[in-house]
């Protein structure tokens, strides 16, 4: 089902890409909006201040035909960009200039990084020997100061999504500032600037050419394909985060490429490139060609396909050289010189000692500003304005990947049985096409008129032997000790993840839960079965003392829809969601909303007060579900993370608000009880409640046991 889901979502994005552009007038009306969206998705909105570059040449290397200046500049204070500037000798007038963006070519020896500019020196040398100035940049990750591109790829930094951060934005910004630097050089003709690079550098060539019209011609090499290749064919697994935007507006890559039009653009690739497959490259080219045709500039768009794999070869280099000769020089001579390397890595090194004030290694923590901590609103009107702004921004920036229209639920009862005085039911429903989920209900057999529903949203964090990570027994019936809580009595222990829930429930209902056991495997041992039976008996006994319907839902990727358990595969599944302008967490919020909607379609359940319950990430997902789904009476939130820095990732959420502000909004709509959570950091919700005169029971906090 997951494969089909990704196919369907990718197809929707592909179909919408540039679909509204029918005429040149359409394009002109949309172009600047698109460009501003791209700035935003590259973490560049608002655009950083253009501070003093503090450019410095640290040395020179001489060749008989050109000079190489070893230089650095600061694109932001402390964000150093190391580069080599190739200058032809005996220039008579300002020359056409190429910004060359380096790909992933590490040059590291004896613990010293010389920068990936060294790996691409032959390109700079060719351009300089043929009358061009060429500035070759190091990248953030593989420069002389080593930064990071692999936040979600291998470092588990999912908060990058919540920040709206991508290292592609740093590379784009460094390129913009590189053009600023080139404009300060008397040798450079600023009206004849071109951009190229291959692999990662090909991607950065796309960013700078799309964002900055100072680039008059571009020739990205092996740096683009479409979402179908990335998401459906799995190409994403071979790429780090510098290749991707934060896809807030759900673009396909042709939309980036179209922003270069009508300027000269050459798309270059090979026919056997496994990380930029040819079919996706050509689909991208076909969509971009339409935009060039609208401009009557079809001859400004070219495509070159060379033979072979993902490799820097003459078959790709020569067409690029010719492209710039034609469009920056107005000539097309025979290419007689090959691109060759002349220097050792040590020759091109900029820094003998790295600067102490560099922020390169941690720029991901500061590049995108987060939302400022809000003040408590002075009155109801101010609060409503703030609340409505937050909700609108969340829907637009964080949850745009939700379906725009409600698909059919297709609710069907799977089973309904009674054992040991407990009625246990299950209903299948569709959260989205290709996302089937199952809703479970349990209550005492004799219950006729329930007074509440407690819907527990299970997470994927497995424990062993039905024990919590704190050693407490897992339990299925919970609630605070308040009289109006959804379950009577003090909370006992920690409610389980799906596998623990299954172990408990199948002690009484093994036949009904056969599919679930097959889905997750790993049956329990005798000792665990005995313990699970004891947990079920406590659950059964609790149901006899109240009128609560206990309900359970496992969102996508958990329970029946469990995916490949391999940790690396789980990472790449999450990154696929990310590329589609979603996150796994944000779509689990949607699943929770759909579970509530499904409940309302079950006979007799429409008007029963419904509470949501969850812990850790599921607790935050429930919190946001309550902001967008009407009719939720209350929230029981356990071990609630205080920030999306450590909690679930939703695109851009930290640019809008953080968890405490979401708690305040939820508390206006329903009762919110935060349990087993550090008491510090929740003062905003309490202050809003007090200032606006809400009922004292709207927001309650029970700190961690033993906390002072």
What are these regions (language model features)?
Residues 1-81, 234, 255, 261-263, ...:
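Alpha/beta-hydrolase-fold serine-hydrolase catalytic core, especially in secreted/extracellular enzymes
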Residues 124-144, 545-562:
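Conserved alpha/beta-hydrolase
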Residues 99-102, 137-139, 221, 457-458, ...:
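Alpha/beta-hydrolase
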Residues 93-105, 450-460:
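Short beta-strand element of the alpha/beta-hydrolase
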Residues 90-93, 153-198, 215, 489, ...:
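Gly/Ser-rich "nucleophile elbow"/oxyanion-hole loop immediately N-terminal to the catalytic nucleophile
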Residues 84, 95, 108-113, 139, ...:
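Short, solvent-exposed loop/turn and secondary-structure capping segments
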């Amino acid at each position: 089902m997951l494969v089909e889901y990704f196919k369907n979502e990718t197809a929707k994005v592909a179909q919408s890409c540039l679909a509204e552009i029918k005429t040149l007038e359409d394009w002109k009306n949309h172009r600047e909006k698109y460009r501003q969206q791209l700035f935003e998705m590259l973490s560049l909105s608002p655009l950083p201040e253009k501070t003093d570059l503090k450019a410095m040449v640290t040395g020179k290397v001489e060749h008989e035909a050109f000079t190489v200046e070893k230089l650095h500049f600061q694109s932001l204070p402390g964000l150093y960009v190391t580069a080599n500037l190739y200058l032809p000798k005996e220039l008579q007038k300002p020359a056409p200039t190429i910004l060359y963006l380096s790909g992933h070519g590490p040059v590291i020896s004896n613990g010293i990084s010389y920068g990936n500019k060294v790996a691409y020196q032959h390109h700079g040398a060719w351009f300089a020997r043929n009358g061009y100035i060429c500035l070759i940049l190091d990248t953030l990750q593989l420069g002389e100061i080593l930064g990071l591109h692999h936040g979600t790829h291998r470092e588990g930094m999912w908060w990058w999504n919540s920040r709206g951060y991508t290292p592609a934005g740093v590379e784009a910004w460094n390129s913009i500032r590189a053009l600023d630097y080139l404009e300060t050089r008397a040798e450079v003709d600023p009206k004849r600037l071109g951009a190229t690079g291959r692999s990662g550098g090909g991607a950065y060539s796309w960013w700078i050419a799309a964002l900055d019209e100072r680039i008059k011609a571009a020739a990205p090499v092996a740096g683009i394909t479409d979402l179908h290749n990335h998401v459906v064919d799995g190409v994403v697994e071979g790429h780090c985060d510098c290749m991707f935007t934060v896809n807030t507006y759900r673009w396909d890559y042709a939309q980036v490429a179209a922003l270069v039009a009508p300027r000269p653009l050459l798309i270059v690739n090979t026919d056997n490139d496994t990380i930029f497959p040819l079919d996706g490259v050509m689909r991208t080219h076909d969509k971009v060609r339409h935009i060039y045709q609208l401009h009557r500039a079809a001859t400004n768009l070219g495509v070159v396909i060379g033979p072979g794999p993902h490799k820097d070869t003459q078959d790709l280099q020569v067409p690029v050289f010719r492209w710039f000769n034609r469009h920056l020089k107005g000539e097309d001579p025979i290419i007689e010189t090959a691109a060759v390397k002349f220097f050792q890595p040590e020759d091109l090194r900029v820094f003998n000692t790295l600067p102490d004030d560099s922020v390169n290694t941690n720029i991901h923590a500061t590049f995108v500003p987060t939302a400022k901590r809000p003040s408590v609103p002075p009155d109801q009107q101010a609060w409503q304005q703030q609340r409505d702004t937050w909700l609108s921004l969340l829907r637009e920036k964080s949850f745009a990947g939700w379906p725009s229209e409600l698909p059919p639920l297709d609710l069907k009862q799977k089973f309904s049985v009674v054992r040991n005085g407990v009625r246990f039911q299950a209903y299948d429903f569709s959260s989205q096409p290709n996302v089937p989920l199952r809703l479970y209900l349990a209550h005492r057999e004799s219950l006729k008129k329930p007074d509440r529903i407690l819907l527990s949203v299970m997470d994927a964090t497995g424990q062993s032997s039905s024990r919590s990570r704190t050693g407490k027994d897992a339990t299925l019936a919970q609630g605070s000790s308040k009289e109006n809580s959804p379950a009577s009595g003090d909370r006992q222990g920690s409610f389980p993840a799906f596998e623990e829930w299954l172990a408990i429930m199948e002690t009484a209902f093994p036949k009904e839960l056969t599919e679930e056991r097959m889905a997750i495997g790993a049956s329990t041992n005798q000792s665990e079965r005995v313990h699970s039976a004891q947990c079920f008996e406590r659950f059964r006994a609790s149901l006899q003392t109240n009128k609560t319907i206990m309900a359970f839902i496992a969102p996508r990727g958990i329970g029946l829809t469990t995916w490949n358990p391999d940790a690396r595969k789980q990472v790449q599944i999450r990154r696929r969601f990310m590329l589609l302008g979603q996150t796994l967490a944000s779509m689990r919020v949607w699943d929770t909303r759909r579970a509530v909607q499904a409940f309302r379609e079950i006979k007799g359940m429409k008007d029963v007060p419904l509470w949501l319950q969850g812990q850790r990430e599921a607790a935050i997902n429930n919190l946001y579900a309550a902001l967008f789904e009407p009719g939720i009476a209350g929230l029981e939130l356990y071990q609630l993370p205080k920030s999306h820095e450590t909690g679930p990732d939703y695109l851009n959420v930290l640019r809008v608000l953080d968890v405490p502000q979401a708690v305040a909004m939820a508390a206006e709509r329903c009762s919110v009880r935060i349990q087993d959570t550090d008491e510090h950091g929740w003062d905003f919700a309490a202050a809003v409640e007090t200032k606006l005169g809400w009922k004292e029971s709207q927001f309650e906090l029970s700190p961690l046991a033993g906390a002072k």
